[in-house]
Amino acid sequence: MRLPMNTSLATLKPSGIRRINALAAQHPGCIALALGEPDFPTPDVISAEVTAALGRGDTHYPPNNGRPVLREALSAYMGDAGLTFSADEVILTDGATEALSATFMAMLNPGDEVIIPTPAFGLYESIVVANHAKAVFLDTEPAQFQIDEEALRACVTPATKAIVICSPNNPTGCILNAASLDAVARVAEQAGIYVVCDDVYNRLVYVDGYERFARRHPELREQTVIIESFSKPWAMTGWRLGWLAAATPVIAEIAKAHQYLVSSAVSFEMDAAARALTVDPTPMLNVYRARRERVLAALDAMGLDVVEPAGAFYAFPSIKQFGLTSEDFCIKAIKEANVALVPGNCFGTEGHIRLSYCVSDQDLDEGLSRLSTFISTL
């Protein structure tokens, strides 16, 4: 006899990105331009802190929210970026994923709604649905992946609890301009909703003029939650370290969810996390910038339209001209050209593919060559 399980989870599907990577793994020699993971090792000075921590037996329970000295460092780090949060308003988390999970667990009641501008990382919808709430999608493609205020207002209902924004964006690489940020602020203030800022790519920006929502709109501090991660800027994806910041009344509730989800982040990684904050990610950023230029030139040569990415390490070109669904296009590319990309439908936007350029230069060049050859056959 099969006993019932959580009906909300039953509606969720495994990650489409992981599904594509699993298919690619079945094809020897396949070049994967699919996973958003830096191809660099974690800087040695960061890793050395873990070795030292283990050597002195730093393997016991830490404070739930992270050691005070680390939270002070995170507070100062955010302050340097113009974001004012005290150490008591910061929680060290098991990656940005847990930060998002704890945030929505603390924030949502059954039947609440969260506005998700698409294309968007599929995790947002999954966490919202798992908390018995509803994801409401705002299509940003007509606005060149910016947020149109009228369209945003049309998504708001009495059940709306929050909007989640990601800038630079996964999968487009686009950054939200001032008009988009201001539109979110006006709607959030008037509707009385939270703004959850997924800022995990904020150190990976290639153009001038980038602004973060919380810095531009400090008047909404009580309604804003900031999610950050060590994974992208310092190549620490496997460490599972992130943090979040919010005003005291909000952080107090999120801290409860964090405590009962994971208790705490890993004790012997905390000194390494503090050290990471002092490491300049510019060398990696410069490599990504050069790869971005090669990707844009290659896509242009292939005749693929793309809204130029200003950050992160993705491009999101249109494939509408080929008359294939994004899923069919990507499966066909793996089977016929041995190159893996992510279908746009994984992010809620059909007719596009996500191309990740956080791979070695050799793999990137070969992958682009294979993609070009594949497109010429369609």
Language-model features: locations:
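A short acidic, glycine-rich active-site loop
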Residues: G57-Y61
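Class I S-adenosyl-L-methionine
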Residues: L70-R71
